[in-house]
């Protein structure tokens, strides 16, 4: 094992016995540490206060330092989705044994939703239900995807890690988040905005589709809250998992992997939340992944005007995501 081949688990619980155990799988570049400690902005704390014990995972990426060199980042070359699913299985076994529930619920946000589906494919006897927070597993009308050339391109580039800093750079990203956290009403670095909070709101509003990443300009979330969430991201993520995702999404049963072998024959209950801000194809694929999974117990929630991050930290998330999730889990707790 290399220096970064380790995972972590954060346990969130109230005093007294729990009614259920939930394993939470973060999105790309996210981790299991509580960046936000108010219950209305943190699903883990909301559930824990209501008797649902939560174990939030740190992927191996949490161990990789932000200033890792290209040579050090070669460690991410073999961090495939299958490797992460094996890590998730180890975390699930620990959570089951520690929490005292033979079956656990698994929640995943974004890429974590993809990994939640994959884990449930490999360990259906251990999963009481899936909480899918704005993420697809399969695509309704994906074209054929040839994995080999994509892997060859990765090999040729030598870029085994994607950088959440993007074109603006990690340091500039972090400085913007820190400035908004310190005082969202402070003057903006860009004079076209009246405050640094407004500047971040516009950056997030236009990062993907308009309102796709978040919809603060539409009043669905607050820049200062989003900044606190984003500041604690991990910088690096294995690029090979983008290839894995396209491989699995492109067919009902990808021959290159066993991570989707049970899709279409699922018997696991599924609770889905999908944000409209991510676009029509995103919603269609998220719904398709749940409805055609094979499960006879699928609950769908399409969140109008929500951006991706608003599902976690939006002003209405506690009422429209957290509360229904708690009720759904309690109704299905073994």
What is the meaning of each model-derived region?
Residues 15-62:
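Short, surface-exposed "cap/lid" segments of acyl-processing enzymes
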Residues 258-259, 297-334:
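Catalytic active-site module of serine/aspartate enzymes centered on a nucleophile-bearing elbow/loop
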Residues 74-98:
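Alpha/beta-hydrolase active-site loop
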Residues 146-278:
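Alpha/beta-hydrolase
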Residues 274-303:
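Conserved loop-alpha-helix segment in the C-terminal half of the alpha/beta-hydrolase fold
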Residues 1-17:
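N-terminal cap/lid segment of alpha/beta-hydrolase-fold proteins
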Residues 113-124, 130:
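Short glycine-enriched nucleophile-adjacent loop
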Residues 99-110:
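Alpha/beta-hydrolase fold nucleophile elbow
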